[in-house]
Amino acid sequence: MMPDLFDDGDPSTEVADTVRRIAIAGFHALWEGRTPTLNELGGGDGGALEEAVAHLQARGRIEVTADGHVAAVHGLSHRTTQHRIDHLGGRVNTWCALDAIGIPAALGIDARARTACPTCGGELVVTLVAGQPESLTGAVLWYPETAGAWTHLVDQFCSGANLFCSLAHLHERVGAGTDSGTVMTIREVAELGREAWADVGGRP
């Protein structure tokens, strides 16, 4: 299961609501190519906003610029990464390959998820039609796992949630049986994405 925004914390109801508002509204803004300010997303309570941002930052679930703009949240990133989504409205970068496949699956849109095999560097393109991924022969995703809660989503989870061109290349990279995780098919990744991004609604 994808790490939840609150799986390692117990914020107050007000702070939890602010966290979700930042994540969902920030997601839609980034999808549209904007980097909104925290004040735009957080509502009127400055204390709740400050606590919500601290909660997200401490857990690696948001990136904020020095002047207070949201540069990444809920899987989307304004900065260039190795993973991106090409869709009819443009393109957007993501934190990991799982995001690149799972988000358009959740939105039910036509898109191409672009990433690269970490072992050989070969480009991998997953085509989705109305949110349904087409097959990509041999490609599998590594889903990192941990015994406890993730303390930093991007550094600990997203850095390892990669798509590989083959199971052999996955094993070369992570080491067969030496790392904790699950091998997933592209269809399984899409289904997980529908669950993880159910909160962003339908098409943006």
For the regions a language model picked out, list residue spans one by one.
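Short, amphipathic alpha-helical interaction segments positioned at domain boundaries
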Residues: 72-110
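Short alpha-helical segments that sit at the start of domains
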Residues: 1-24
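Short acidic, hydrophobic short linear motifs in intrinsically disordered regions
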Residues: 26, 30-45
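A short, conserved structural fragment
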Residues: 57-68
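Short amphipathic alpha-helical interaction segments
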Residues: 42-58
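Short, cationic-aromatic polyanion-contact patches
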Residues: 12-19, 66-88, 130, 139-141
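Long, low-complexity, charge-rich intrinsically disordered regions
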Residues: 109-112, 123-204
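Short cysteine-rich clusters marking metal-coordination/redox-active sites
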Residues: 117-120
